[in-house]
UniProtKB/Swiss-Prot annotation:
Start and end residues of each stretch annotated as Type DYW motif: 649-743
Lineage: Eukaryota, Viridiplantae, Streptophyta, Embryophyta, Tracheophyta
Taxonomic source organism: Arabidopsis thaliana
Protein name: Putative pentatricopeptide repeat-containing protein At1g68930
GO biological process: RNA modification
Type E(+) motif: region residues: 618-648
Keywords from the named record: Repeat
Record carries keyword Repeat: yes
Name of encoding gene: PCMP-H22
Amino acid sequence: MASNYYSVQIKQCIGLGARNQSRYVKMIHGNIIRALPYPETFLYNNIVHAYALMKSSTYARRVFDRIPQPNLFSWNNLLLAYSKAGLISEMESTFEKLPDRDGVTWNVLIEGYSLSGLVGAAVKAYNTMMRDFSANLTRVTLMTMLKLSSSNGHVSLGKQIHGQVIKLGFESYLLVGSPLLYMYANVGCISDAKKVFYGLDDRNTVMYNSLMGGLLACGMIEDALQLFRGMEKDSVSWAAMIKGLAQNGLAKEAIECFREMKVQGLKMDQYPFGSVLPACGGLGAINEGKQIHACIIRTNFQDHIYVGSALIDMYCKCKCLHYAKTVFDRMKQKNVVSWTAMVVGYGQTGRAEEAVKIFLDMQRSGIDPDHYTLGQAISACANVSSLEEGSQFHGKAITSGLIHYVTVSNSLVTLYGKCGDIDDSTRLFNEMNVRDAVSWTAMVSAYAQFGRAVETIQLFDKMVQHGLKPDGVTLTGVISACSRAGLVEKGQRYFKLMTSEYGIVPSIGHYSCMIDLFSRSGRLEEAMRFINGMPFPPDAIGWTTLLSACRNKGNLEIGKWAAESLIELDPHHPAGYTLLSSIYASKGKWDSVAQLRRGMREKNVKKEPGQSWIKWKGKLHSFSADDESSPYLDQIYAKLEELNNKIIDNGYKPDTSFVHHDVEEAVKVKMLNYHSERLAIAFGLIFVPSGQPIRVGKNLRVCVDCHNATKHISSVTGREILVRDAVRFHRFKDGTCSCGDFW
């Protein structure tokens, strides 16, 4: 009797939130240990099963080991524990040890592979079962395989399973027919989905929702609306229509659909709320979002995890992070989705360090990340070039098995590329079993950032040969690589192919890349002609690019035109004043320099101060020119003095042509010596052990003199120095730079 009582208690815990479920199961388990010295096997099995569903494989194993004579249910529950936890090697080892196997055993094995994204292994296990143990085949097995086919877009596999469904006579069963319909609808095979739909003996609202979802996913809006108007609708139906409209770029119509549901007086639940909020976020419609938030509070859904997560996402997309944080802090229960919404929200609004902190807090709270959350955390590290935390997350990806997901691998390729470790980025890319268009684009962008045009173009060509269609980001990387390598004609060719071959309408960013292509090569007149032929005027980036090139080439005429155009576009943009001032200074026109400075003061235009940073032992050390705030100031300045003497002996000659002050030459030289990147490099030489590269970031373009000085520093110290400035990566080693002095 006692065993039955405790068994019921454990079963009642299943379905509670992760935190409560864990607490109550462990509490009941403790009571069992104290009250029952020899629990019955079926009670042990229920405890193992509960721990399995909680992904607590360690506890599940401990309980299993206490069972005197484990039966098949015991073994299946242990197998389930490893399956749910993603511990594939332990799952396989347990499977091999099983004294007997039934349909549940095979289903758990196949589902374990499926949950870990190991499609090939799941298919192999299924085929083995069909060949040698077909008697164990159940409708659950077929349902699992259909879900696998659907989530991974494997149409041929899905059709193979469909054939077996027909052969076994399961086609009319809802348990199989529902995932079969969903599979076809999800992969866009609408005609097949309709055949399954009309072949079912009983069609419920779930079936209608699946078919409607497939129509919406294929952009067949009118067909979906026709089905929607004639069907019996539940809240999921309304939510699916709202979500489908939003995903087809009809966010306003999605919000209107929500209003129609509300006007009809239909009962609101988590599904419509969770679908309309992303539409508000996509439009940046904060007022509508706040109104829906008020409706959520009135209907008492503010504590629902799904709704709370959607609210966080909406506020983050509307750049209202303080509202997002308020919603998050007030949530009584949080799951991986709500934590992920915060990580993504902070990461995509430029607050990457806080995003990483939120991710670490999530792990401390006992919630394991999924592949999407981990991928977003790694992306946040990439955005701030934080290789230290990113490498730790790489380790987490390996130990958790999430490395097999393409989203995680893509983020790691991007991380190492953005942190200047192009070798590790390439190695990871080559090791990927599955690559999508994002994988190739990440690698193309990494090579482009390093100015390795040949590799960039070769990789792009391979991507196209593999049948993957490049997007605007991919073409940006290719044209940028051509620009940094001075391959003007190739860059022009790829720009033309965007429209003619790939159907991509060039954005303002692509036009800026083309301005950069001409400007870097000194073909300033061609850049000017290109600008005059554009369908719209350049943005600030385009004008600044041309103006920077005019400064480097000393072209006052075109530089003045670019500066005046930039100032007209944005009177408070400092680049128009500072870059033109630099051209005047290089030509000794100090009166013109003074006039520009007066104009800046009158309009309250402030130049963005140059800042460089280096991360060491988890702490970010930032420096500005002539910085006196560092606690290591004396050591840094002494190191700079020592370096300056060594590089002068090595042939370094200061270039003061772009110093904007009318002062003595010696003063100009001294000003150059204490630029922010040199302070950061000196810090690295003092504290970063030899054998490790020194990694420095800078918010502006590295000046010509500091670039030259850093080459000499790498020569006299024998150290590898990586500098990521606003333009590209520079890898200084043995007196040379990876950019070939072209940046």
